[in-house]
């Protein structure tokens, strides 16, 4: 999969369009669009099996899906800080950023642990070397962990963002904050 992950570099070119896109849509909507791309990527990658063209397409879509949340997530934190200021509370950008970083570390640790548990439960034996033949259950788990399981988490993010309403109020809040 090393060569396949190079295709995510192609998706990085979409970052050039982000400033223009943010003039027409909110940060939340751009992240939601990325979630949709990742969900589609997960389906494509799961169905691809050993089809290199589909794997390349899925990896490009995956990159296009992960970039918005990676790059635009901090902007949501700034919107929350603006909201705090609008409510008369301290902005707390540092605290919000630290919580975000801490949550990322905890999430990565839990995700890595669960990957190990699921791979072990599927019959994967990593210490057998190149001579081992992986059981079908381990191959299926690898496919699931690379495709549908992350896509399901992006679907959860997409659902949660439906309840994020600051994007509709942020321009008015920022104007009020500047007037104070």
Model-inferred region functions:
Residues 1-180:
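Membrane-embedded alpha-helical bundles of multi-pass transporters/translocases
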